[in-house]
Every structure is written in structure tokens, then in C-alpha cells.
Amino acid sequence: MNKWVTATIVMTSILTSFAPMAMDKRYVATPQQSTWQMVTNTPLECRLVHPIPNYGDAEFSSRANKKINLDFELKMRRPMGETRNVSLVSLPPSWRPGESADRITNLQFFKQFDGYIGGQTAWSLLSELEKGRYPTFSYQDWQSRDQRIEVALSSVLFQEKYNVFSDCVSNLLTYSFEDISFTILHYDRDNVQLNKASQKRLAQIADYIRYNQDIDLVLVSTYTDSVDSRGVSQDLSERRAEVLRDYFKSLGLPEDRIQVQGYGKRRPIADNASPIGKDKNRRVVISLGRTII
């Protein structure tokens, strides 16, 4: 009886000693595996990706906009089966054992979604990586309640590609598709060319189109004031429309994606009795459409 009790105690002790080893499952690229890839580098978008073996990809991205922006996504091979509370800490690499862990924040990963962080916290991740540390996400495994998952970003080989990413972000256009998708520009009297202020705005639209392959429709509608006769006004608006058709074709857009229409003095938006009203009516409305996948 005593031998049985002793054996049971010994076995229990052995199992207990091994239990903590089964509690955590850690995903991180080894120094030999660690890579950072600049997968998109254009004036419209910057994307920096870090593969995490057997787990998925960590991705930083920033897009053309009025405001500087940064998004981070933890793209998982298997989406979260349940919503989980997540602890985000910054850990030192194994070769710097004297350093302590620093808490960054607490957040949630939602069921059926990849992990997402935006704003200042995303910038904090980059800052920790630049210091050579390992930002680490920790949460309870939704498949095994007695196990926690740890997912770490390796800072090995980070700095070089981060420099490229930073340069890309600094060169992003300072406006988004939404800022230019509907634009009203203006003409001087009896001129088929836009006025100087509108030409600058048109150049912005052109820059966006040059770098975006998703623009599949450009609608151009031109209008005049009421100074001239109906026939003269119609002819002027049609010539203005054709000038813009040629302009958008020169950017590489296929002709079947460009639709232009001259309306002459029809559809005024202001009173033609005043100079200000005439200026407003001498206009072109440019609308852009794009394919969203």
C-alpha cells in the first residue's frame, strides 16, 4: 500500500513538473528564419510583412491620406474561433537576459477576424522592434482552455526594411481616393484649359491614377456660363470635354473607361447674373470609379 502511495505521489510530481511546459504554445521566427519583406512600395500604399512560421503573417501598412496613418494586422492561418482578451508586451531577445518585459497594452482579438491594431499602439510596435525587442501577443487558446498562445514578432533583420518602409510612408500622397473621387474644377472665360488652381488639382488626380490600376471609370461633365448663345456654349463645353478625354488617355487609361459629356449652358448651379455665379457655372465635374475586390 505504501509503495502504491509513494509511486502515485512520484508520478503526480512528475506530471505536475511537466504541466507548465504544456501550458504555452509559442510562435516566433528563429533568428535564422526571421525575414521582413517590403511587399508594396508606392505613393499610394506601403506594406511591410513579417512571416511567423506555422502561424501566419504580421503586416504593417500605411496608405495615401491627408493624415499619417498606420495599421497592423496579425494575419492568422486559422481565424480566431472565439473572441479573446489579449495581452501585448515587449520582451527582450534571449541574448539580452538582463532586460525586463514591458507591458504595451491590453486588447481583444475578435472571433473570425485577424488581429488588428491601429493608431499610436501600432507605432509603438515599430518602436519596440527598432529597439531590438520582441513585441509579443498572449491569449488563451480557444481550442484548448488550459493552454495559452504566444505570438512574437522577431526584430532580427528588421531595421533595413523598416528604413525602406519609413521612406515609403514619407512619400505617400497626401490625399486618398475619397478626396478626389468627386471633383469640381473651373475654367476662365472662353478657355478650353482649366484655370491655374484647377490645373493643380487635376495634376493630383493624375498622380493618383498613374499609381492605381483599379480606376475603371472616369466620368467628365463640362458646363459653361450663359454669356454666349446655346450653340456656342455647347461647342465650347464639348471641346473642353475632349481636351480632358485626351488628357486621361495620356495617363494610360483605355478609351472605353473614359466617358465625357458637354452640357453647354444647361444645368447652372449659380445665378449667371453675377460674375461669381458665372465663375461657378464654368465648371467640369470629374467622377472616378474603381474596382473593389
Curated annotation (Swiss-Prot):
Domain (OmpA-like) spans 175-292
CDD domains for the chain: OmpA_C-like
- Record function comment: May play the role of a stator in the sodium flagellar motor, stabilizing the force-generating unit through direct interaction with the cell wall. Involved in adherence and invasion of fish cell line.
Provide the alphabetized UniProt keywords.
Cell membrane, Flagellar rotation, Membrane, Signal
Q: How does it sit in the membrane?
A: Peripheral membrane protein
Q: What is this protein called?
A: Sodium-type flagellar protein MotY
Q: Which Pfam families match?
A: MotY_N (PF18393), OmpA (PF00691)
**UniProt GO BP:** archaeal or bacterial-type flagellum-dependent cell motility
NCBIfam families, alphabetized: FlgprotMotYVib
- Signal sequence span per UniProt? 1-21
Q: What happens when the gene is disrupted?
A: Mutant is nonmotile. It has an intact but paralyzed flagellum, and shows a decrease in virulence.
Q: Where in the cell is it found?
A: Cell membrane
PANTHER family the record matches: LIPOPROTEIN YIAD-RELATED, STATOR ELEMENT OF FLAGELLAR MOTOR COMPLEX
Q: Name one GO cellular component term.
A: plasma membrane
The UniProt gene name for this protein comes to motY
Q: InterPro entries from the xrefs?
A: Bact_OuterMem_StrucFunc (IPR050330), MotY_N (IPR041544), OmpA-like (IPR006665), OMPA-like_CS (IPR006690), OmpA-like_sf (IPR036737)
| Predominant place of localization | membrane
Q: Which Gene3D superfamilies match?
A: 2.60.40.2540, OmpA-like domain (3.30.1330.60)
Q: Which organism is it from?
A: Vibrio anguillarum
